[in-house]
Swiss-Prot record:
Assembly information from the UniProt record: Part of the 30S ribosomal subunit.
GO CC, one annotated term: ribosome
Keyword field contains Ribosomal protein: yes
Protein name: Small ribosomal subunit protein uS10
Stored SUPFAM superfamilies: Ribosomal protein S10 (SSF54999)
Record Pfam families: Ribosomal_S10
Entry keywords, A to Z: Ribonucleoprotein, Ribosomal protein
Disulphide bridges: none
Length: 102
């Protein structure tokens, strides 16, 4: 698999969970002999929802809720077959979304 690159993109609502997952991935990849670039923190996506507090009156009283999506990017340069196998076996928390591009 010489000359190839694997790009892993992680998304999660909790920054501690995504950082620990990125640490696990980097640790696993370096143990198998491939080079790693990252984790690179990408901009946090912030969605704000505005809701009227009362069900039928008082439009001036509103409540704001926000949802933050944290993202990280990890590049694996020159992966070995052992690297790919160990990444497939890696256990990560349920709150982390993973996209892998070859």
């Amino acid at each position: 698999m010489a000359g190839q690159k694997i790009r892993i993109r992680l998304k999660a609502y909790d920054h501690e969970v995504i950082d620990s997952s990125a640490r696990k991935i980097v640790e696993t990849v370096t143990r198998t002999g491939a080079r790693v670039a990252g984790p690179v923190p990408l901009p946090t996506e912030k969605n704000v929802y505005c809701v009227i507090r009362s069900p039928h009156k008082d439009k001036d009283s509103r409540e704001h809720f926000e949802m933050r999506t944290h993202k990280r990017l990890i590049d694996i340069i020159d992966p070995t077959p052992r690297t790919v196998d160990s990444l497939m076996r890696l256990d990560l928390p349920a709150g982390v979304d993973i996209e892998i591009k070859l």
